[in-house]
Protein backbone atom coordinates (compact mmCIF):
# COMPACT_ATOMS: atom_id res chain seq x y z
CA UNK A 1 0.00 0.00 0.00
CA UNK A 2 0.95 3.65 -0.45
CA UNK A 3 0.75 6.01 2.54
CA UNK A 4 0.26 9.77 2.08
CA UNK A 5 -1.16 13.00 3.51
CA UNK A 6 -4.25 14.61 1.98
CA UNK A 7 -6.85 17.30 2.71
CA UNK A 8 -9.58 15.35 0.86
CA UNK A 9 -11.79 15.34 3.98
CA UNK A 10 -11.02 18.94 5.02
CA UNK A 11 -8.05 18.39 7.33
CA UNK A 12 -4.45 17.26 6.80
CA UNK A 13 -4.76 13.56 7.56
CA UNK A 14 -2.92 10.37 6.66
CA UNK A 15 -4.41 7.89 4.20
CA UNK A 16 -3.35 4.66 2.56
CA UNK A 17 -4.34 3.20 -0.80
CA UNK A 18 -3.45 0.43 -3.18
CA UNK A 19 -0.77 1.34 -5.76
CA UNK A 20 -3.47 1.67 -8.45
CA UNK A 21 -5.24 4.39 -6.38
CA UNK A 22 -8.13 2.21 -5.23
CA UNK A 23 -9.22 1.27 -1.70
CA UNK A 24 -8.36 4.64 -0.09
CA UNK A 25 -8.48 4.45 3.71
CA UNK A 26 -8.30 7.37 6.15
CA UNK A 27 -5.93 6.47 8.98
CA UNK A 28 -5.97 9.63 11.14
CA UNK A 29 -8.89 11.89 11.95
CA UNK A 30 -7.99 14.19 14.86
CA UNK A 31 -7.96 17.94 14.25
CA UNK A 32 -4.45 18.99 13.28
CA UNK A 33 -1.68 18.38 10.82
CA UNK A 34 -0.61 14.76 10.26
CA UNK A 35 2.13 14.39 7.67
CA UNK A 36 5.36 12.86 6.44
CA UNK A 37 4.30 9.22 6.86
CA UNK A 38 6.62 6.28 6.20
CA UNK A 39 6.00 2.56 6.53
CA UNK A 40 8.25 0.49 8.77
CA UNK A 41 10.52 -1.90 6.86
CA UNK A 42 8.07 -4.79 7.38
CA UNK A 43 5.05 -2.61 6.51
CA UNK A 44 3.29 -3.22 9.83
CA UNK A 45 3.65 0.31 11.26
CA UNK A 46 3.74 3.93 10.13
CA UNK A 47 5.79 6.78 11.58
CA UNK A 48 4.68 10.40 11.04
CA UNK A 49 4.81 13.92 12.45
CA UNK A 50 1.77 15.68 13.85
CA UNK A 51 0.62 18.99 15.27
CA UNK A 52 -2.47 18.55 17.43
CA UNK A 53 -3.87 21.90 18.56
CA UNK A 54 -5.67 21.46 21.87
CA UNK A 55 -7.14 24.80 22.94
CA UNK A 56 -10.09 26.51 21.28
CA UNK A 57 -7.78 29.37 20.29
CA UNK A 58 -5.16 27.03 18.78
CA UNK A 59 -7.82 25.10 16.85
CA UNK A 60 -9.29 28.35 15.49
CA UNK A 61 -5.81 29.53 14.42
CA UNK A 62 -5.04 26.19 12.75
CA UNK A 63 -8.41 26.08 10.97
CA UNK A 64 -8.11 29.69 9.71
CA UNK A 65 -4.63 29.08 8.31
CA UNK A 66 -5.68 25.78 6.74
CA UNK A 67 -8.57 27.54 4.96
CA UNK A 68 -5.88 29.65 3.23
CA UNK A 69 -3.80 26.56 2.41
CA UNK A 70 -1.27 27.30 5.15
CA UNK A 71 0.03 25.70 8.32
CA UNK A 72 2.18 27.06 11.13
CA UNK A 73 4.95 24.49 11.50
CA UNK A 74 5.93 25.07 15.09
CA UNK A 75 5.26 22.24 17.52
CA UNK A 76 5.40 18.88 15.77
CA UNK A 77 5.64 15.58 17.63
CA UNK A 78 6.57 12.15 16.27
CA UNK A 79 3.88 9.46 16.29
CA UNK A 80 3.79 5.74 15.45
CA UNK A 81 0.68 3.76 14.51
CA UNK A 82 -0.20 0.37 13.11
CA UNK A 83 -0.56 0.29 9.32
CA UNK A 84 -4.37 0.15 9.67
CA UNK A 85 -4.40 3.42 11.70
CA UNK A 86 -4.93 1.79 15.11
CA UNK A 87 -2.63 2.25 18.09
CA UNK A 88 -1.64 5.87 17.43
CA UNK A 89 1.10 6.67 19.95
CA UNK A 90 3.04 9.91 20.46
CA UNK A 91 6.68 8.99 21.03
CA UNK A 92 8.18 12.48 21.49
CA UNK A 93 6.82 14.89 24.08
CA UNK A 94 9.11 17.91 23.95
CA UNK A 95 7.05 20.69 22.33
CA UNK A 96 9.73 21.26 19.69
CA UNK A 97 9.61 21.06 15.90
CA UNK A 98 10.27 17.34 15.37
CA UNK A 99 9.98 16.25 11.74
CA UNK A 100 11.30 14.04 8.96
CA UNK A 101 10.94 10.73 10.81
CA UNK A 102 12.29 7.65 9.06
CA UNK A 103 12.67 4.05 10.17
CA UNK A 104 16.02 2.40 10.75
CA UNK A 105 16.05 -0.84 8.70
CA UNK A 106 15.88 -2.84 11.97
CA UNK A 107 12.30 -1.56 12.35
CA UNK A 108 12.84 -0.81 16.04
CA UNK A 109 14.34 2.69 15.87
CA UNK A 110 13.37 5.96 14.21
CA UNK A 111 15.64 8.81 13.14
CA UNK A 112 14.26 12.36 12.88
CA UNK A 113 15.23 16.04 12.93
CA UNK A 114 14.46 18.39 15.81
CA UNK A 115 15.32 21.76 17.31
CA UNK A 116 14.66 20.48 20.85
CA UNK A 117 18.14 21.33 22.17
CA UNK A 118 18.34 24.87 20.75
CA UNK A 119 16.71 27.53 22.95
CA UNK A 120 16.34 29.82 19.92
CA UNK A 121 14.61 27.07 17.90
CA UNK A 122 16.77 27.75 14.85
CA UNK A 123 19.30 24.90 14.90
CA UNK A 124 18.12 21.41 13.93
CA UNK A 125 20.00 18.21 14.62
CA UNK A 126 19.30 14.52 14.02
CA UNK A 127 18.07 12.24 16.80
CA UNK A 128 17.35 8.53 17.12
CA UNK A 129 14.60 7.12 19.31
CA UNK A 130 13.22 3.65 19.98
CA UNK A 131 9.80 2.88 18.50
CA UNK A 132 8.28 3.01 22.01
CA UNK A 133 9.67 6.52 22.72
CA UNK A 134 12.56 5.42 24.93
CA UNK A 135 16.29 5.62 24.25
CA UNK A 136 16.47 9.13 22.77
CA UNK A 137 19.95 9.80 21.40
CA UNK A 138 21.33 12.90 19.70
CA UNK A 139 23.16 11.98 16.47
CA UNK A 140 24.49 15.30 15.09
CA UNK A 141 25.93 18.30 16.92
CA UNK A 142 26.10 21.06 14.31
CA UNK A 143 25.15 24.73 14.30
CA UNK A 144 22.54 25.25 11.60
CA UNK A 145 20.27 22.74 9.93
CA UNK A 146 20.44 18.95 9.68
CA UNK A 147 17.22 17.33 8.45
CA UNK A 148 15.38 14.83 6.24
CA UNK A 149 17.39 11.77 7.32
CA UNK A 150 17.01 8.53 5.35
CA UNK A 151 18.78 5.20 5.81
CA UNK A 152 19.90 3.01 2.95
CA UNK A 153 17.81 -0.20 2.85
CA UNK A 154 20.69 -2.23 4.31
CA UNK A 155 21.30 0.33 7.10
CA UNK A 156 24.93 0.85 6.12
CA UNK A 157 24.47 4.52 5.18
CA UNK A 158 22.64 7.56 6.45
CA UNK A 159 21.76 10.35 4.00
CA UNK A 160 20.50 13.78 5.12
CA UNK A 161 20.26 17.42 4.10
CA UNK A 162 22.36 20.05 5.86
CA UNK A 163 23.49 23.64 5.54
CA UNK A 164 26.83 22.88 7.20
CA UNK A 165 29.78 23.88 5.00
CA UNK A 166 27.46 26.08 2.93
CA UNK A 167 29.16 28.21 0.30
CA UNK A 168 26.24 30.69 0.26
CA UNK A 169 23.64 31.71 2.83
CA UNK A 170 20.66 29.36 2.63
CA UNK A 171 22.44 26.64 0.67
CA UNK A 172 21.53 23.07 1.63
CA UNK A 173 23.60 20.08 0.56
CA UNK A 174 23.15 16.33 0.71
CA UNK A 175 25.46 14.39 3.02
CA UNK A 176 26.09 10.66 3.28
CA UNK A 177 27.88 8.84 6.08
CA UNK A 178 28.57 5.26 6.98
CA UNK A 179 26.30 4.22 9.85
CA UNK A 180 28.15 2.50 12.67
CA UNK A 181 26.08 0.98 15.48
Predicted feature residues:
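Sequence signature of WD/YWTD-type beta-propeller architectures
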Residues: 1-181
